[in-house]
């Protein structure tokens, strides 16, 4: 689902702080968790950046924060922009970022990411094309969801896309194991049929922290070992 947004800087900050609706992955549920979703666990949930690679996110340009109620975590980028036309180099038309995260959860719980909200800004000349892609997977597991959203010029506005998967299709981290959660995103800008002398761009970056990607947790309790 694609929603252009018209917001002020203050409104964007409020929007980024709010819980919203959004993503992930598929195939069969992981073994070792009970069948029904649980409330967010008490105690501290922490998300650490294990590594960051890609043309859209040099080290230090992506930050992560966990919601106080353990319902979600946010990723904020500061330099993630793809551009085309107007003399931009061909390499500027595609940017990517691979984040590998360590998610520390209270004992007895496991998690999946049930939905994700991506936000950014697009300036596309008439005929230009922008693309946002994302996939997610746990370290050592093959389950990967690929989601693609396209935007067509003319566009000069904030944008939002939401990726979501039903609870019956979620993939949970194996109980009792620490596996990195990997997020692979891509941003493209293409001239298309637009005037190649004019610049078009797509961004998910935020210089003031007002635009973040929001990853919503789904929790399950692990069976008690006897």
Language-model-derived ranges and their functions:
Residues 189-226:
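Proprotein-processing/basic-patch segments
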């Amino acid at each position: 689902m694609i929603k252009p947004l018209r917001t002020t800087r203050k409104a964007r900050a409020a929007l980024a702080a709010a819980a919203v609706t959004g993503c992930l992955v598929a195939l069969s549920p992981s073994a070792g968790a009970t069948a029904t979703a649980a409330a967010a666990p008490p105690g501290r949930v922490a998300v650490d950046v294990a590594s960051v690679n890609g043309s859209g996110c040099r080290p230090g340009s992506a930050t992560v924060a966990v919601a106080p109620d353990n319902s979600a975590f946010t990723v904020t980028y500061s330099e993630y922009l793809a551009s085309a036309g107007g003399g931009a180099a061909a390499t500027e038309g595609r940017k990517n970022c691979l984040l590998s995260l360590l998610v520390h959860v209270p004992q007895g719980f496991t998690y999946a990411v049930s939905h994700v909200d991506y936000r950014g800004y697009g300036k596309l000349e008439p005929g230009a094309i922008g693309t946002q892609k994302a996939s997610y997977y746990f370290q050592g597991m093959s389950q990967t969801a690929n989601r693609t959203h396209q935007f067509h010029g003319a566009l000069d506005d904030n944008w939002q896309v939401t990726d979501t998967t039903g609870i019956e299709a979620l993939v949970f981290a194996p109980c009792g194991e620490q596996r990195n959660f990997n997020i692979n995103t891509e941003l493209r800008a293409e001239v298309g049929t637009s005037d190649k002398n004019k610049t078009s761009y797509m961004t998910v970056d935020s210089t003031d922290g007002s635009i973040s990607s929001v990853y919503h947790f789904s929790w399950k309790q692990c069976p008690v070992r006897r």
